[in-house]
């Protein structure tokens, strides 16, 4: 059973998937930083300096804190600001992946077009066919008697 598991893990597809998941996790961190550190401050500046992360609705009368962390400590809250931030993260990530796939598809299409446009070179005929062609050509140039 252990040897089967080792063989399964050592297969190329599983290793490629593992690398993809690790890189995807790191890419998610980059997108989160892009949204939190670069995009959200600009959005906040445009819309009057608000921060989505602290937008919430208290679900009980005991919650009266000004920040989301303090409000969660006091009771249940509907944290729609956090959801908006995650939604923006997702949309940016989806847009980036869409652009990457679109670029790869465009490059693939260009390569296919170049392959179709390039004339196919016929392989040289076999030696015996070349010899027979030369003999035919020589016989055709001989004067007939």
Curated annotation (Swiss-Prot):
Membrane topology classification: Multi-pass membrane protein
Keywords: Cell inner membrane, Cell membrane, Ion channel, Ion transport, Membrane, Transmembrane, Transmembrane helix, Transport
Cellular compartment(s): Cell inner membrane
Keyword Cell membrane: yes
Listed Gene3D superfamilies: Large-conductance mechanosensitive channel, MscL, domain 1
Transmembrane domains' residue ranges: 14-34, 38-58, 81-101
InterPro entries per UniProt: Mechanosensitive_channel_CS, MS_channel, MSC/AndL, MscL_channel
Record's keyword annotation contains Transport: yes
UniProt-listed SUPFAM superfamilies: Gated mechanosensitive channel
Major place of residence: membrane
GO molecular function, one term: mechanosensitive monoatomic ion channel activity
PANTHER family assigned: LARGE-CONDUCTANCE MECHANOSENSITIVE CHANNEL, MECHANOSENSITIVE CHANNEL MSCL
Job of this protein: Channel that opens in response to stretch forces in the membrane lipid bilayer. May participate in the regulation of osmotic pressure changes within the cell.
Subunit annotation: Homopentamer.
Protein name as catalogued: Large-conductance mechanosensitive channel
Record organism: Rhizobium leguminosarum bv. trifolii (strain WSM2304)
Species classification: Bacteria, Pseudomonadati, Pseudomonadota, Alphaproteobacteria, Hyphomicrobiales
Gene name, Swiss-Prot/TrEMBL: mscL
């Amino acid at each position: 059973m252990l040897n089967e598991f080792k063989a399964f893990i050592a297969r190329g597809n599983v290793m490629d998937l593992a690398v993809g998941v690790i890189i995807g996790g790191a890419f998610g961190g980059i997108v989160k930083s892009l949204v939190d550190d670069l995009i959200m401050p600009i959005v906040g500046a445009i819309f009057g300096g608000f921060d989505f992360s602290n937008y919430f609705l208290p679900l009980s009368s005991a919650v009266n804190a000004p920040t989301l962390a303090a409000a969660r400590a006091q009771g249940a809250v509907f944290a729609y600001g956090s959801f908006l931030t995650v939604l923006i993260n997702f949309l940016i990530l989806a847009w980036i992946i869409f652009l990457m796939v679109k670029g790869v598809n465009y490059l693939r299409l260009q390569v296919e077009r170049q392959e179709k446009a390039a004339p196919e070179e016929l392989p040289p005929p076999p030696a015996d066919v070349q010899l027979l062609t030369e003999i035919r050509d020589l016989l055709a140039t001989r004067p007939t008697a």
